[in-house]
Amino acid sequence: MKKELIVFIPSIEDGGVEKNLFEVSNYLSKNKINLEILTCNNNMSTNFSKEIKFIGTKNTFWQNKNRSIKYLACLIVLFFNLIKRKKKPLVFAFQANMYATIIAKVLNTKIITRSNSAPAGWSQNLIKSLIYKFCINLANEVMVNSTEFKKLFEKKFQVKVTCIYNP
């Protein structure tokens, strides 16, 4: 039986994260992982193997919306997609980690989160930081892309972090 994985990335743009997304997704697909990409940017499908299924909004209306709108749209799709499945897939969140984790945990689904930005820039607010700490500790696995981020996450959020360098 093939393993199932939903890659949650509401907004696919041009950058290093996306390059990693293409490489990792295509690698997993070649290695017999049933992979689905949940995004508002179906226009980026040409960068992926033909075996990879795109779920989410198909309408081009969403492609040029801001990240917050894309996050909301894809979180709604994630919620209903997980509800209708008998066998729950693993969710791998590239973006909107906190929100995707809440949905996954409410629906008894395993989730891996990936963070590639240092918490110092976005976690200055104490309440926001405490909420994030609570949510990130619900994830089954937390990944970062450098030993520096690993140390920062472990210290600030008291969470076990795996460091996987960019391919």
Where are these regions (language model features)?
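Active-site proximal beta-strand in glycosyltransferases
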Residues: 90, 104-121
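N-terminal strand-loop element at the rim of the active site
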Residues: 7-66, 149-154
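Carbohydrate-associated surface elements
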Residues: 148, 167
